[in-house]
């Protein structure tokens, strides 16, 4: 893989800049946007970026940092899903707490925002409190967003309980957008000043990157990733007016800046040190880019990937037509097409060939996989196994120089598994999934040296690209994710079944 980003340089620059910002205050409330862990988008568009860079940065500053996690009560009620992991936001909070503790980081508490006694939220609060985790309930802020006098009063932020913190940097994070991070920071700022403490607010968001051009593919890829939020990148006019310098930000931050500035000035009783929304940020990711061409190409591929993802989400009913069209339009505006993703044409051509040969209207799943050396392999679904499993077996055979004719998994192992699924468990679909095939392969590896060699090649699939001609099940997608494979799908179901397609 060609590297376009210097991770070590970025970590050094970023930690230094945060410490410089905190020096101005007794306490800095740092709103962390995006993903704190497993930032797969950043990893894809910035080749060389560590997906856990943010948490490693915090680990570096661990003596000075504690963390507050926000979760919007409405997201608990409607079981909002974190798309890249397929888990609900409340479950993601539990995972996040475990991961933060694994990095020796102190989790202060969980804040439930816009709380109004929702039943499912109360169950989640009980779960946390009975495990010894502090929970604060923040109701919707009266007067927000326009009535600044009410917002900054005992009727507004004053109604929220004060969260006791002890360290100079308080990171406020969440599973996703719209979780109430900003409101929590400002509420704390209000309480700090009421207590006579000098506190500050800053924002750490990786995208859009303020110091790369507005129409750079890296920033366009961010728009593509947030089509459902209707985010649009813009030139920060406040920054240009103040410094005569061009900086990129996004519409929500620019639109909310005048009110946010007034709220901060009302809380502190003095003129804000921030002249623009860009001023509020501490992001230094742009300084880690070492090869702009590599980043541009990776970002273009991400735009195509996002168009596929949005098309599948539209088919599943998760997004509206406007979102679907916007993702497609962004791709077309960059003069890109689906076929610019190398694995798309081989998958589609093989699927068309199979359909012609079978002379049936049935859809056959074909998965194409591009290896590190540029080789493209395909696998098809059959009565025995899914297309994902077939292509993985073909890939490990390729890496291990094992002939196609050699079976890695003995029928003695496969047949009892299929019988178990069909007869004992009564499964409608008996074809083995990718995960089931990998488990069967690991069993064979205990007695078969060839299978053992093939098993050893699985880590080589990390970073590979794949495309499926049909929508994959959640389990198949998660198995590919665990293997480190980026997969896209055509927005077509394998059959007319409504339940068994999932």
From Swiss-Prot:
InterPro entries of this UniProt entry?
A: DUF1846, DUF1846_C, DUF1846_N
Q: Known Pfam families for this protein?
A: DUF1846, DUF1846_C
Give the UniProt family note: Belongs to the UPF0371 family.
Q: Which HAMAP family match?
A: UPF0371
Identification of the protein by name: UPF0371 protein CLI_0399
């Amino acid at each position: 893989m060609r590297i376009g980003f210097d991770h070590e340089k970025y970590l050094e620059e970023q930690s230094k800049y945060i410490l410089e910002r905190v020096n101005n205050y007794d306490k800095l409330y740092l709103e962390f946007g995006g993903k704190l862990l497993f930032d797969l988008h950043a990893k894809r568009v910035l080749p060389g970026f560590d997906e856990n860079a943010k948490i490693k940065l915090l680990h570096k500053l661990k003596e000075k940092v504690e963390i507050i996690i926000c979760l919007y009560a409405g997201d608990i009620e409607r079981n909002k899903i974190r798309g890249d992991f397929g888990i609900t936001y409340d479950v993601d909070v539990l995972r996040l707490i475990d991961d933060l503790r694994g990095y020796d980081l102190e989790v202060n508490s969980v804040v439930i925002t816009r709380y109004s006694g929702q039943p499912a939220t109360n169950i989640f609060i009980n779960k946390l409190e009975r495990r010894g985790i502090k929970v604060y309930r923040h109701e919707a802020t009266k007067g927000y967003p326009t009535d600044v006098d009410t917002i900054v009063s005992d009727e507004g932020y004053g109604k929220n309980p004060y969260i006791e913190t002890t360290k100079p940097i308080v990171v406020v994070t969440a599973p996703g957008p719209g979780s109430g991070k900003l409101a929590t920071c400002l509420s704390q700022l209000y309480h700090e000043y009421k207590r006579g403490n000098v506190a500050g607010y800053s924002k750490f968001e990786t995208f859009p990157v303020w110091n790369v051009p507005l129409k750079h593919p890296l920033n366009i890829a961010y728009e593509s990733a947030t089509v459902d939020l209707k985010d649009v990148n813009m030139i920060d006019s406040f920054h240009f007016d103040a410094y005569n310098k061009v900086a990129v930000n996004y519409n929500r931050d620019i639109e909310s800046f005048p009110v946010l500035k007034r709220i901060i000035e009302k809380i502190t009783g003095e003129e804000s040190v921030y002249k623009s929304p860009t001023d509020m940020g501490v992001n230094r990711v742009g300084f880690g880019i070492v090869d702009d061409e590599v980043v541009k190409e990776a970002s273009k591929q991400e735009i195509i990937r996002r168009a596929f993802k949005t098309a599948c989400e539209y088919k599943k009913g998760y997004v509206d037509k406007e979102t679907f069209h916007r993702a497609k339009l962004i791709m077309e505006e960059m003069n890109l097409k689906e076929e610019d993703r190398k694995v798309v044409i081989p998958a589609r051509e093989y699927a068309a060939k199979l359909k012609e040969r079978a002379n049936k209207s049935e859809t056959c799943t074909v998965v194409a996989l591009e290896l590190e050396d540029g080789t493209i392999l395909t696998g098809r679904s059959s009565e025995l196994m899914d297309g994902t499993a077939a292509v993985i077996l073909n890939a490990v055979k390729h890496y291990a120089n094992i002939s196609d004719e050699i079976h890695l998994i003995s029928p003695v192992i496969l047949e009892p598994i299929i019988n178990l699924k069909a007869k004992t468990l009564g499964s409608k679909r008996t074809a083995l999934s990718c995960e089931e095939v990998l488990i069967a392969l690991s069993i064979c590896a205990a007695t078969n040296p060839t299978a053992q060699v093939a098993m050893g090649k699985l880590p080589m699939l990390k970073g590979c690209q794949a495309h499926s001609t049909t929508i994959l099940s959640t389990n198949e997608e998660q198995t590919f994710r665990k293997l480190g494979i980026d997969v896209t799908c055509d927005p077509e179901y394998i059959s007319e079944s409504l339940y068994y397609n999932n």
